[in-house]
A protein has these predicted regions:
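Short, solvent-exposed loop/turn segments at secondary-structure junctions
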Residues: 33, 63-64, 96-97, 149-150, ...
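C-terminal extensions of enzymes
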Residues: 1-20, 26-33, 41-42, 146-152, ...
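Non-catalytic, usually N-terminal nucleic-acid engagement modules in DNA/RNA processing proteins
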Residues: 1-182, 296-299
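Conserved, mostly hydrophobic/aromatic
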Residues: 24, 57, 92, 134, ...
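Glycine-rich phosphate/ribose-binding loops and adjacent secondary-structure elements
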Residues: 179, 188-305
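Glycine- and acidic
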Residues: 151-155, 159, 216-222, 331-334
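Short, electropositive alpha-helical surface patch
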Residues: 155-166, 174, 199-212, 339
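Alpha-helical packing segments of well-folded alpha/beta enzyme cores
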Residues: 130, 161, 165-168, 172, ...
Length: 376
């Protein structure tokens, strides 16, 4: 995997680059819409590429393993062919989802035994099993199997969990070395920095992850309930250690202002369910602030959803109409807001890229963070 950095910001650690995969290039900073089971909720593929301008989407190993299952994905020729998606895909390892099943899983050195949230059936994920499943799924970027400790975690638990993640990483690498790609294109492993909210553990984990010289590196276990400033602090500490010539992926983050602040810290890649999940509840992100479209103040507002954006939904529907759809519980309402929020997120990271390249990123970022976080 080639990652070329084209510009650095003079006043922060932000950078603009291009990541090359066998399914196409990805310009960074980038936001990856979350397509958990092979679809971004409520959004057509055509709109993902033509309206939202998505360059890569994210799939979930745990969910794709449970359904449709690896047998069907193998028959289809991998997830790209199954869903007829021609651009890059990243899959997480399933670790976060498995560990979120707190009452229905057991962690051992070997891996994690868990019960399906669908039918209660018993399953086991090991590092090797996660890599095997991700080979069958066939994503361009695959994540190492890790343990994501809950917040808060005591120091001893966090330390033991971090070391387990490191041992599991070695097993992931060993499996991939012995079991090559299935579908004729390259897959690239990103290991995950853990360490909970302990500075020394984060440093130790970042150093271990960096030593593996993988295609890129990820930061996990943040944005799980800790204070925002703590998330920024740990992100900066880790970015200071991870190699500058490899892409850095901050998992599960976040709000538009979180994303800009973390771009300034040196992060290149983001994913989050927030733009679509919040959209389904009527929350709309804009450059001027956050709208709750269900509020009565929008009942008679016939202005366009967002006249500053060129997407079809933004130039077609009024706030009053969208509010009407939500109040009537019409499915079109969440579809419109989901597309808008994703359009806005992709516009935001592309705008950040342009500001990095022209040398105005930090000034622009400071203005945007204040505006975007305002409740309208």
């Amino acid at each position: 995997m080639n990652f070329n950095i084209e510009s650095f910001d003079a006043h922060s650690s932000a950078r603009a680059g291009t990541l090359h995969t066998d399914h196409g290039k990805i310009t960074t900073p980038i936001f990856m819409p979350v397509g958990t089971i092979g679809s971004v909720k409520g959004v057509f593929h055509r709109d993902l590429t033509e309206q939202i301008k998505a360059q890569i989407i994210l799939g979930n190993t745990y969910h794709l393993y449970l359904r449709p299952g690896t047998d069907l994905l193998k028959q289809a020729g991998g997830v790209h062919k199954f869903m007829n998606w021609k651009l890059p895909i990243l899959t997480d390892s399933g670790g976060y989802q498995v560990f979120s099943l707190a009452a229905n899983r057991k962690i051992t050195e070997e891996g994690v035994n868990f019960s399906s949230h669908i039918d209660g059936s018993k399953h086991m994920f090991s590092p090797e099993k996660s890599m095997e499943i991700q080979r069958y799924i066939g994503a361009d970027i695959i994540m190492a199997f890790d343990e994501c400790p809950p917040y808060p975690s005591d120091y001893t638990y966090a330390k033991n969990s971090m070391h387990l993640t490191h041992r599991w990483l070695d097993r992931c690498i060993n499996y991939l070395d012995k079991n090559k790609e299935i579908y004729g294109y390259k897959q690239h492993l990103f290991p995950i920095v853990q360490g909970s909210t302990y500075k020394d553990l984060r440093k130790q984990s970042a150093e271990y992850i960096a030593s593996k010289n993988c295609s890129g590196n990820a930061i996990g276990g943040l944005s799980v309930g800790e204070p925002t400033e703590m998330m920024y602090e740990h992100t900066q500490d880790v970015c200071d250690i991870l190699p500058k010539d490899k892409p850095r992926y901050l998992m599960g983050v976040g709000t538009p202002w979180n994303i800009l602040e973390c771009i300034a810290l040196g992060i290149d890649m983001f994913d989050c369910v927030m733009p679509t999940r919040n959209a389904r509840n009527g929350q709309i992100f804009t450059a001027e602030g956050v709208i709750n479209i269900k509020n009565k103040k929008w009942e008679n507002d016939f202005s366009l959803l967002d006249s500053s954006l060129s997407a079809f939904v933004d130039q077609t529907y009024s706030k009053a109409y969208i509010r009407h759809l939500f109040m009537a519980k019409e499915i079109l309402g969440p579809m419109i807001t989901s597309m808008h929020n994703l359009v806005f997120y992709l516009w935001l990271v592309n705008e950040a890229r342009e500001k990095i390249k022209d040398g105005t990123f930090t000034h622009w970022k400071n203005i945007m963070v204040k505006k975007m976080s305002t409740r309208l």
